[in-house]
Structure formats: C-alpha cells, structure tokens
Amino acid sequence: MLDIEGTTCPTSFVSDTLYPYAYSHLEGFLNEHRENNEIQSLIDEAWREWQADTDASSKDLLSKALRKNSSEIVNICSYLHHLITIDRKSSALKDLQGRIWREGYEKGDLCSSLYPETIEALRKLKQQDYVLAVYSSGSISAQKLLYRHTADGDQTALFSHWFDTRTGNKKESRSYSDISIAMNIPVEKVLFVSDSYAECNAAEKSGMSVLFSLREGNPEQDPHDHKAIKELCCLFDYLL
C-alpha cells in the first residue's frame, strides 16, 4: 500500500503545481458550479468545518468574514485558501481540489509528474501478483486523476484499492486496521510505504510492515527507527 506525495510522486509537483492550480481556480470553479447539488454540499461541509475550527487564525478569519457583506463564495474561498496556505487536511477541500484538477487535466493544463522508476516498479509488482493499494490524503478522485494522466498513459488499472482521509486519519492506527478489513487482507501481510514518520508509526502499530520513503526534497528526512528506501524499486528487497 502506497502513499503518493513523497513516495511515488515528487512533493514539488503537489506543492508547486497542483496546490497553486487549485488555489487560483477555486473561486471561479465554485461560481461556475454553485448550482450543482454536490458542490453546494461541499460548500456546506466546508462551512461546518470552519465553524468547528478551533485554530485562532481560522476563528479570526471567520469573525472577519461574518462582519463583511461578501458573497458566500467569496467568504468560503477565504477559508479554503487559508487551508491550502497552511496545508491543513480537509475532506471538503480535498474533494473540491480533485474536481478542479480533473478540469485541469482534461483541458491539458496538468500532466502528472511521477518519480522516474515509479511506473516500472508498479508494473513489476503487478506482474508478480502483489495487490496494490493507494492511501493518500488527497481524495480518491484526485488519486485516480494523478495516475490516469501520466506521460506514459493511464496507470489506474495497476491498483486494486483506493483510500483517502474519508476512511480515517492517516496518523491513527485504527485507519490502517479498517483498511486491512476493507481489502480482506490480514494486516500483517500489508506493507505500507510513506514519507511520514507519524503515518509509518500508525501503520506499524496496527500490525502492518512499513518502509519510510526517504527522497530528496521530502519535508521529513529522518526515518528514526523505521527502515528506509530511497527509490520505490528498493522495496523489492523487503517483500516476502
């Protein structure tokens, strides 16, 4: 089971390409699709998240928004832009970002950037009958878009399972136990690869084997007590 950012895809593609694209297109997208029931539900969900947000900067932003005579779209965009800026995980935001990126991929504005060895390693795993799964903080829709729009074509058929934060927090061991049940695979037979020490800890606590993705450019560079790999092809040394 693989994380995406910092594991199969450079963090720079997400931080320097995908996030800025969603940021700049967010308000226009919401205005264009505001009559769509699904989009309105996501706006409502984001409002509920904002009202429950205990972060001081978020509360201050909400207070200012309520005092202004701005439209609902302008107000909620200020919060969503804030979440993007501080890289806060939000299910509503992730869903909206995925929809914006879909339009970007379909228009040809975006093309996924994966590590050079990623596709070859994934294909080799598939050929050896390993079950491949994704667990990322990005929405499942966004995950599939990333693997569908690569320079080498659609790679989504390589994966059997897709999981995002709607399954559970990636830093909580219960999430990994639930994923094991969903895949119908004993937890001790799952190997999880991530660039996050906290995620590796949570997965290991659930009973999974873990590998820390130690790539140049990743925010975290200390695997602590976890075994680390510097390229995805290196994980074959740890497979049963």
Swiss-Prot record:
Superkingdom of origin organism = Bacteria
Question: What InterPro entries does the database record attribute to this sequence?
Answer: Enolase-ppase_E1, HAD-like_sf, HAD_sf
Q: What class of enzyme is it?
A: hydrolase
Q: Which reaction does it catalyse?
A: 5-methylsulfanyl-2,3-dioxopentyl phosphate + H2O = 1,2-dihydroxy-5-(methylsulfanyl)pent-1-en-3-one + phosphate
Q: What is its EC number?
A: 3.1.3.77
Keywords in alphabetical order: Amino-acid biosynthesis, Hydrolase, Magnesium, Metal-binding, Methionine biosynthesis
> A single GO molecular function, which one?
2-hydroxy-3-keto-5-methylthiopentenyl-1-phosphate phosphatase activity
Q: How is the cofactor bound?
A: Binds 1 Mg(2+) ion per subunit.
Q: Which Pfam families match?
A: Hydrolase
Q: Which family does it belong to?
A: Belongs to the HAD-like hydrolase superfamily. MasA/MtnC family.
Question: Subunit composition?
Answer: Monomer.
Query: What NCBIfam families would the database entry show?
Result: enolase-ppase
Q: Which PANTHER family match?
A: ENOLASE-PHOSPHATASE E1
Record's protein name? Enolase-phosphatase E1
Protein species of origin: Prochlorococcus marinus (strain MIT 9303)
Upper taxonomic classification of the species? Bacteria, Bacillati, Cyanobacteriota, Cyanophyceae, Synechococcales
